[in-house]
Amino acid sequence: MPEGRRLRRALAIALLALVAVTGLLMMAKEQQMGQEISPFDGHSNLALAQAVARGDTQGIHAQATQDRLRERGDRQVTLLQWAVLSQQPDSVQALLDLGADPAAAGLDGNSALHTAAMLQDAQYLRLLLAEGAQMNVRNAVTGATPLAAAVLAGREEQLRLLLAAGADTTLSDRLGDTPLHLAAKINRRTWRCCCCRPGPMPGRATSRASRSSFTSRKRRRICRMTN
């Protein structure tokens, strides 16, 4: 696939993901204002989801069972993603304490880590990383990592947090693009420099990834050019 088409497709996927996140953010805000709107309407864990959206940790513990924690809402959104989208850090922590999996695939194939990497507020990603979440988890549809989600969403702080936690810049998605490649294509100066850190060279899992991989010398050159 030509480079331009691959980039347009990656950006289109990122845009659709951001639209979905924005829609659920609005839904979460409406529910906090007392309107009966939830992606968990009609699900057995609706009361638990409502407690999550309110930040009601006592209600979360009272309602939580393993089956309810695993049950997904509309568009496969997980409760942990719902807590992040509802911007309720106490709910995020309560769900983590109860064993919710940050790496579980949910909304549009993304994990809660992907969702947290796309939001403006970085505290939710910090909470997940503090629990030892798997930072290189793949989107179930695209194969993209949370680091790629942060690059495409333009979240510099999340990018730095993931890199500091050891996120791999060389893991390609199903189109063969790595977070490092995406950062260079989008021409984000700061993020290209962030990606130019010592680390393993891109693997040779596919010939496409191998052909397009950056060398360490190229990484250093990009850093010098963007300083």
Swiss-Prot record:
The keyword Signal applies. The keyword Ligase does not apply. Cell-protective protein that neutralizes the intracellular lysis capacity of phospholipase A1 through a direct interaction with the enzyme. Keywords: ANK repeat, Repeat, Signal. Disulfide bonds: none annotated. This is Protein PhlB. Coiled coil: none annotated. It comes from the Bacteria. The gene is phlB. It comes from Serratia liquefaciens. Residues 1-35 form the signal peptide. ANK repeats lie at residues 75-104, 108-137, 142-171, 175-204.
